[in-house]
Design a protein with these regions (language model features):
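Terminal connector regions
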Residues: 106-139, 379-386
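Short, conserved sequence motifs used for protein processing/export or organelle targeting and
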Residues: 36-43, 71, 83-85, 180-400
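Local sequence-structure signature of Cys/Sec-based thiol-disulfide redox active-site neighborhoods
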Residues: 140-177
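Residue-level detector of functionally pivotal "anchor" positions at catalytic/ligand-binding pockets or at interdomain
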Residues: 25-37, 139-148, 393-425
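Asparagine-centered strand-capping/turn motif at beta-strand->loop junctions
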Residues: 58-62, 261-263
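C-terminal tail/sorting-segment detector
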Residues: 5-7, 433-442
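Bacterial Sec-dependent N-terminal signal peptides
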Residues: 1-29
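Intrinsically disordered, low-complexity Pro/Gly/Ser/Thr-rich segments with frequent PxxP/GP/PP motifs
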Residues: 78-105
């Protein structure tokens, strides 16, 4: 019986990863797998010669205090810096912020960043214990134009969501063409789009910027306002530039999008997402009205740029009529929230082209609020960390050779445009095959 109890005890110890001797602080008695790097955060790109700011959280999941420890930081398995800490109490986590100097000899390119223990409680480990947390860091030598993206969840039934509209408008006004807003409307909205992934966004309203870090309020941000947060992510160097073209097909049921991505680095882990957004979306039915909890308050009791929603002001009703901008209405995401657009590998100083045909929505509750001359395609280029490396936005134009795009002007048929067989417009009649566009749309 004693033997059975002994083996049962040993089995239990093994399952729980408990040290055999609680008073022994040697490395052998500590299960390194229970010392965890819970978070690892840093910019996805820096310039050549710049230092790399790094934030990480270390958690001591053992039953013993860690008196001291040393970790190495690696880029492509080359040690670039070392950090030493002490006094990690059992069952506690600690946040560490450091600046890692990067050798100027490291050239432009993409590097894998890892972190690993080399010493614990004064003992040097025979084998470096590396964390499973890894990041890709790009080092670039050229400053490229940067476009930042806010992805926000909002809803017309959310009474606090009007401040998200203001936050997005503030970013648009300040950053102009360097800002892209993407508003993902919630369930029961006529603008609800179920295919869009909203990882990390749980409360209404909330947003992410360039898909970096945690979610935040789209108006207050995490510091002194959303503008400060956006300025911070805009400081991260871009590794690519994106140019974009988008046109409707003949009956505006599809949009053909073409993006050209010029890259500073070689990369096989980048992807591209196409998102269609609508501006000035409106319908006079009740289900399009925006809820507004700020209507409970007097103008003097709310912040200056929220006064428009206070009692007695322009939008001081609950609910109120509103024209919505930056609304997601279609994308390259499928029903399973899987991105269907593809991107070939990027080459240093090379250009890669991506094509995608996006189906426009057909649900009448949504389409009756769409203004087809206020529709845009956004191309988001995603790096290996899942963050937006750069983006572009373009107004969707009509297919100039598309027969269905012409409005009927009179009952009598007449030629209003001529095109060559290559689709280019010609000014007058000439010998050879021509495509004629008539005033009745044929």
């Amino acid at each position: 019986m004693n033997i059975i109890k002994k083996y049962l005890l040993l089995a239990l110890i093994s399952l729980l990863h408990l040290p055999l001797f609680a008073d022994n602080n040697s490395v052998n008695s500590i299960t390194l797998a229970r010392i965890v790097f819970e978070e690892l955060s840093m910019p996805s790109a820096i310039f050549v010669g710049e230092a790399l700011p790094c934030d990480f959280r270390i958690y001591n999941g053992t039953l013993q205090k860690i008196k001291d420890y040393t970790v190495n930081f690696y880029l492509n398995d080359e040690v670039v810096s070392t950090y030493s800490g002490e006094n990690l109490a059992s069952g506690n986590g600690y946040n560490v912020s450091i600046i890692i100097p990067i050798p100027e000899t490291l050239k432009q390119g993409q590097y894998e960043f890892t972190i690993g223990f080399t010493k614990v409680n004064g003992e040097t480990l025979e084998t470096v214990y590396k964390s499973s947390k890894r990041r890709t860091v790009s080092i670039v030598a050229e400053k490229l134009p940067r476009v930042g993206v806010m992805e926000e969840i909002t809803a017309r039934w959310c009474g606090w969501c009007p401040r998200g509209h203001v936050g997005m408008e503030k970013l648009q006004n300040k950053f102009k063409d360097s800002f892209i807003g993407i508003a993902i409307h919630g369930y029961k909205d006529p603008m609800y789009y179920p295919n869009y992934p909203i990882k990390g966004l749980t409360s209404y309203p909330s947003c992410v910027l360039n898909r970096t870090g945690h979610s935040m309020d789209p108006y207050y941000g995490t510091e002194s306002g959303i503008v400060d947060n956006f300025e911070k992510v805009m400081k991260v160097p871009a590794t690519v530039t994106v140019t974009l073209d988008a046109t409707y097909n003949n009956d505006s049921s599809y949009i053909d999008a073409v993006a050209q991505i010029k890259s500073l680095i070689n990369a096989e882990d980048y992807s591209i997402v196409f998102v269609v957004t609508g501006d000035d979306m409106y319908h006079d039915s009740q289900i399009w009205k925006q809820a507004n909890y700020y209507a409970r308050y007097s103008p003097s009791s709310v912040l200056a740029d929220l006064k428009q929603f206070a009692y007695g002001e322009k939008y001081g009703k609950n609910p109120f009529d509103y024209h919505y901008d930056n609304v997601v209405i279609a994308s390259s995401y499928s029903d399973g929230r899987i991105n269907q657009a593809t991107l070939d590998k990027l080459t240093e100083n090379g250009t890669t082209e991506a094509h995608y045909s996006i189906k426009m929505p057909t649900e009448t509750t949504l389409t009756k609020g769409i203004k087809y001359d206020h529709v845009y395609v956004n191309a988001l280029v995603i790096n290996g960390n899942g963050e937006i490396a750069n983006a572009a936005k373009v107004h969707v134009t009509s297919n100039t050779t598309g027969i269905g795009s012409l409005s009927k002007a009179s009952d009598a048929q007449e030629v209003v445009a001529r095109y060559g067989i290559d689709g280019s417009r010609v000014e007058d009649s000439h010998k050879g095959l021509q495509l004629l566009k008539m005033n009745d749309g044929t």
